[in-house]
Every structure is written in structure tokens, then in C-alpha cells.
A protein has these predicted regions:
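Serine/threonine-rich, repeat-prone extracellular segments and beta-strand-based repeat modules
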Residues: 16, 32-72
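Boundary/junction segments of secreted and surface-exposed precursor proteins
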Residues: 73-82
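Solvent-exposed, low-complexity, repeat-rich "mucin-like" stalks and linkers
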Residues: 2-31
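Short strand-edge motifs at loop-to-beta-strand transitions and within beta-strands
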Residues: 40, 84, 124-128
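Flexible, low-complexity linkers/stalks enriched in Thr/Pro that connect modular domains
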Residues: 1-4, 70-73
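Glycine-rich strand-loop-strand elements at beta-sheet edges
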Residues: 101-184, 204-239, 248-250, 278, ...
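Short, structured beta-strand segments at or near domain termini in extracellular proteins/domains
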Residues: 183, 198, 316-327
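Extended extracellular/luminal ectodomain segments enriched in beta-structured repeat modules
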Residues: 89-96, 133-137
Length: 327
């Protein structure tokens, strides 16, 4: 009697990946004899692991079964105010990532129109390929844009200063804008030293709103600026973060006060109505008076895990974002 079941050949890979919201068409399978049936569905609107089963039955009733695994993965990560995770699917050793840091804050309804949107500095962008390991967990931190508040109103710190954007944005002083938070990926842990990709956040404007802060991003982020015409005061702006140190905070020569320096992952805090520094690999320095602005935070990519790197400065408006694509 015939006791050998059919042989099933899957078309394409036995493991497939599709982004949430993408499209999936089953490539199907073939059997060398008998009738082939397919069961299982893939919901591309919901992240998860799905199984498609192929069953073949020959004329004498012998059967064979094989399966295809389809991983529907979350590809777009927006600001959440906390760490998010991504688990590398089976068979994947490289992903493409597009990472955006957050911009500086803008006016809220509490004091609408205080600083025009034209004075909002923008966050940086990093595009790269990242080497990964199947099953590995990536920790994703998407930088926030602080919501501007009028002192005494909502969204204010207890000191009536502007709260820095989540993930490293420096605080604005008084009406000075806060710096934007950085967006990063961490591997092997959740500390600053575990970051393998960082897109820097923008520096905040001083309360006079005569200039925007330094743009985030780049190996060295944008410096802040100042306005010579504001009561003749040529006061200190913050410098952009680099690959080895935070940007220096501005110095107010008239009142002998210095704003906060940037540091690893953190923008400096503004003083005397100055703007905060942007978060980044190294954060930007803050500004020391209302007519000067904070520096942006720098971007970074790991020298051996990342390839085909493109850095762009001053791209993102609003909170950050991170997009993963599996080739």
C-alpha cells in the first residue's frame, strides 16, 4: 500500500515580515500529488505572529502539512512619554531605521501667539541600517516636544519654567522655550551608554522670540543665536552638542550668570528667560537671557552596528518619530 504522503513546497520564504498597515499576499505552496488546501489568515492591522498552514492529501488518504510564519510588526513609533520595545523577527539580521528628534516648544492656548512658529527650531534626522539579531529586543525612546505654557498656567513646572521635552530636552526659563527631546534606540539595556542610534532634539528660543534655537541633529548640532538689538545686550547663547561633549551654556556678561551646559543625553536648562538646550547624544547648552537661544542636541550612530548613515540637521517639527523597515 501507498503510505508515503505528498511533498509540499512553499513558494518563497517560510518566514515573512510585513509592517502594520502594509499589504500581504500569500505566495502559496505546491504539492507533488493530491489536493492542497490552505488555512489561516493574516491581519495586517494588528501586530502579531500569524501562521498559514498548507495541507496536502493524496488519493489514498495520506496527508502532509507544513506552515509559513508571518510576522506583522509595528513599524512606526510615535511619542509615548515612556520606553517602547521592538522584538526582531526570526531570520532578520538587518533593519532600516529613520529616526527624528523633537523640535523646541511652541505656544499653547494658555498664551497663544507668544512665540510665532517661525521661531521653533527643528529636530534632527538619522537614516541608517542597523545590524540586529533575531529575537533581540530594541528599546525605543521617542523624544517629546514640550507644550509651551504661560507661567502660572497648565503644563508649567512648579518654578513656572517650561518643562523640557521628554528624553533630554532642557527646561526653558520663565517664558523661554524648552528644548526638544532626542529619539534613540538602545540595545542590551536602557541606560545612556546602551544607545546605538540617536537623533538630536532642537534648542529653545529665549522669551523675546527674536530668533529660533539651534537645530538638532548632525555630528555637531546647531548653535543658538542672539540679538544685538535687544537693549544692546550681546548675551550668551547655547552651543550645540558634539560627539564628545555637551554644548556650553551661554554666559550673561551683564548679570554674571551662566546657563546650563549640555551633557550626555541631556540639554542644559535656561536662565533669565533663556531657552533650554536640545536633548541628544550630547545635549545642547542653554541660553542665559531672553534675547538668546539654546543649542541643539547632536545625533549619533554606532560605528560598527550602523551602516549607510545619513545625518540631517533641522528636519522635524513636533515630537519625534522612529520608523523601522525590514528589507
Amino acid at each position: 500500500p501507498d503510505i508515503t504522503g505528498p511533498t509540499i513546497t512553499i513558494n518563497g520564504s517560510t518566514n515573512m515580515n510585513v509592517a502594520v498597515g502594509g499589504s500581504f499576499t500569500d505566495p502559496g505552496a505546491t504539492a507533488d500529488e493530491g489536493t492542497l488546501t490552505t488555512s489561516g489568515t493574516v491581519d495586517v492591522t494588528t501586530a502579531g505572529t500569524y501562521t498559514i498552514t498548507y495541507t496536502a492529501t493524496d488519493a489514498t488518504g495520506n496527508t502532509a502539512t507544513t506552515t509559513r510564519t508571518v510576522e506583522v510588526y509595528q513599524s512606526v513609533f510615535n511619542y509615548a512619554g515612556s520606553a517602547q520595545t521592538f522584538t526582531v523577527p526570526v531570520g532578520v539580521t538587518s533593519i532600516s531605521v529613520d529616526v527624528y528628534g523633537a523640535s523646541s516648544s511652541v505656544s499653547s492656548g494658555n498664551y497663544a501667539g507668544y512665540c510665532a512658529s517661525g521661531y521653533q527650531a527643528k529636530g534632527g534626522r538619522v537614516q541608517t541600517s542597523l545590524s540586529v539579531t533575531p529575537g533581540q529586543t530594541l528599546y525605543i525612546y521617542v523624544g517629546g516636544m514640550s507644550v509651551y505654557c504661560y507661567p502660572g498656567g497648565n503644563n508649567c513646572l512648579s518654578t513656572n519654567n517650561q518643562a523640557g521635552g521628554w528624553n533630554g530636552g532642557g527646561n526653558g526659563s520663565g517664558n523661554g522655550e524648552a528644548g526638544g527631546g532626542a529619539t534613540d534606540i538602545r540595545v542590551g539595556g536602557t541606560s545612556m551608554v546602551d544607545r546605538v542610534i540617536v537623533a538630536g532634539g532642537a534648542g529653545g528660543a529665549g522669551s523675546s522670540c527674536t530668533h529660533g534655537g539651534g537645530h538638532g541633529g548632525g555630528l555637531t548640532a546647531g548653535n543658538g543665536t542672539y540679538d544685538n538689538g535687544w537693549y544692546g545686550r550681546n548675551n550668551g547663547y547655547g552651543f550645540g552638542g558634539s560627539q564628545s561633549s555637551g554644548g556650553n551654556g551661554g554666559y550673561n556678561v551683564h548679570s554674571n550668570v551662566s546657563a546650563g551646559d549640555g551633557s550626555l543625553g541631556q540639554g542644559g536648562n535656561g536662565v533669565q528667560s533663556g531657552g533650554g538646550g536640545g536633548g541628544g547624544y550630547y545635549g545642547g547648552g542653554a541660553s542665559a537671557y531672553q534675547n538668546s537661544t539654546g543649542g541643539g542636541g547632536s545625533s549619533y550612530t554606532h560605528p560598527t552596528l550602523c551602516s549607510s548613515v545619513v545625518h540631517s540637521q533641522g528636519v522635524q517639527t513636533g515630537s519625534g518619530q522612529l520608523i523601522i523597515t525590514i528589507p
